[in-house]
Amino acid sequence: MTLTVLNPATEEPIAELEQAGVEETDDAVARAKAAFPAWSAVAPGDRARLLRRLATLVEENLEELARIESGNVGKPISGARGEIGMVAQVFHFYAGAVDKHHGETIPVAGGVAATFREPLGVVGLIVPWNFPANIASWKLGPALACGNTIVLKPAELTPLSAIRLGELCLDAGIPEGVVNVLVGKGSVVGQRLIEHPDVAKIAFTGSTEVGRLVMQGAAGTIKRVTLELGGKSANVVFEDADLEKAAAAAPMIKPIKGSFFKSRLRGFSSSMLLHSILLQTKAGR
């Protein structure tokens, strides 16, 4: 079964992709599982080198990736360029973090207690449609740095930048099977990843409602779960703030900046934290 990918700004088709189902999901998990022993044994310095190479490739292909992101998400190219630049920064950061997560040796009475940090195994990464490349990098970076292998499921509406990132992982020298990208429905591919016994962890960004389903599905195999749900992005206004600017910026509906920021990508107007004195004296604003 094929999936037609649209540019939401023009509603024009921009790609036709094969949709993964349960069988393809199982195959991807099997590939990731087979790649795990060798990848987890790669020396930290070598993993860091590969992540730096990946970051460099993102920088070298920034314009291409930005145009993919702009066309697939329907956002201005200027914003997409900034987001892809941040993707490279994320991979650079985790390249530097590879040798910073380690265990401890703790002296105790009559002996020594030691802790070790080890990769989990296969992790399922499920990302939303609003910042597909950015959020994919937030999940790919730490998973790769720690020696895990990956099945990445982008939103079926916006899979194109994730596919290109998967190709760049191979170009960077990350072995085949370490990063697997699946295009398919959340109710099929996502659900199978959540319930699969060989997936050790799920990292999900999306709605609170679906997050509850992720927790319920993962409970059967007692896998670890990281959820980023229903962000409120509250505005915090202190006593000495410029209230005119705060009042204007909070709804994010001003021309140009606000209209793009509110184009069904993210919103900020639902929450505001005010200093108590402001509530007492200037609540009218």
Language-model segments: which ranges?
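A structured beta-alpha segment of the ubiquitous adenosine-cofactor-binding alpha/beta core
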Residues: V112-A113, N180-A200
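N-terminal Rossmann-like NAD(P)+-binding subdomain of aldehyde/semialdehyde dehydrogenases
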Residues: M1-G111
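Short beta->alpha connector loops at strand-helix junctions that form conserved
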Residues: N148, K153-A155, V183, T205, ...
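Short coil/turn connectors at secondary-structure junctions
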Residues: R117-V122, C146-N148, P175-G177, P197-A200, ...
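Active-site pre-lysine segment of PLP-dependent enzymes
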Residues: A162-D171, S187-H196, E209-G220, V236-D240
